[in-house]
Amino acid sequence: MQPLEVTLKRYLFRLINGFRSGTQYSPSQLPIDSFSRILIIRQHDQLGDLLIATPTLRAVRRKFPNAFIAVVVREYTASVVENNPYVDEIIVFYEKLWRWNIRKLILFWKMLRNDFGCTIVLNTISRSLSSDIIALLSGSKYIVGPDHLMLDPSLPEKIYNVPIRWPSVQKHEIQCNLDIVRALGADENDFEYDLVLTDGEVNEAERIYQSLGIPPGKTVVGVHFGALNPSKCFPLEKLVTVIDWMIEKFNVEIVLIISRNEIERRKIVLSTVHHKLHSAPVMPLRIMAAFLRHMSLVLCNDTGTLHITASQRVPTISFHSLSDPVIWKPPHPRHIAVRANDWLITSITIEQVQEAVITAMKQFVEKPAS
């Protein structure tokens, strides 16, 4: 966070503390059996962060099978939890001020003030003041959150009146989210993500895939090369070398998968690669998720696309820089992370990627051609 942002958040935190009771509850003091309406807030992060939290949504539902469960998310991540069987209602928080109007404000307030007995704030890496304010505005008597993200350590914690002790050992982000609700007796051993698609979305993705003219029976590898942060983008010249090598060694069909921000980068790939590639059109998130089901393997950077692909149980090879894959990579064995020792994306070698491809093809796809 920038210094000005930190100062502002600390000021607001102090202001809130001045008006809120300091009464705290341990998880054992909670009337858990009476929680018939539960609010879960995970609105301050990116697509991948929300998908990582879906096992926690599943855990809460299984602990409270008859409860009404609502989740607060950002507008651009809301489609991740559409059709989720463990969520009854999606409450959208608009990040941009200009996206709000009177009708949206009234609806947001009405949905938020819905007699929630317990609010759970899934803060893990950083503390979101907007999430804290939403939790307070919900009117819940009990607000559950981690105890390690104090904006001002000199003040007592008054927003999370059910503070959950944070573990001192390093864990995967899925485990970190689950730790917050384990105190309520909710747990989950299945770490697969939930992104549940409709038949219409699957059919539209099928139509798009068929339009590419890929011969039946061929092994199809998807390649997504974008990221908003340039430090997370595997160099295109190295990626092109890997693509040509994969086609020659494994006789695969390569499909380039892009967003609107990656059209120019796709032109660079197509102008430098030595083999014919297929290009998928820009697709909405959920259609893209359905489209990814047609891939035998996906190569991508450490972005939301990695986690979207994982949600459809498709093997991946992902390129990582500053974010530790031990913490952030989908934890399932079918996902292989590639990272340089100096954590620089530009230091990842072609040989590292080729080794990962060979492993993935042997273990999850098919044996290499002789």
Model-derived features: positions:
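Catalytic machinery of carbohydrate-active enzymes
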Residues: 1-370
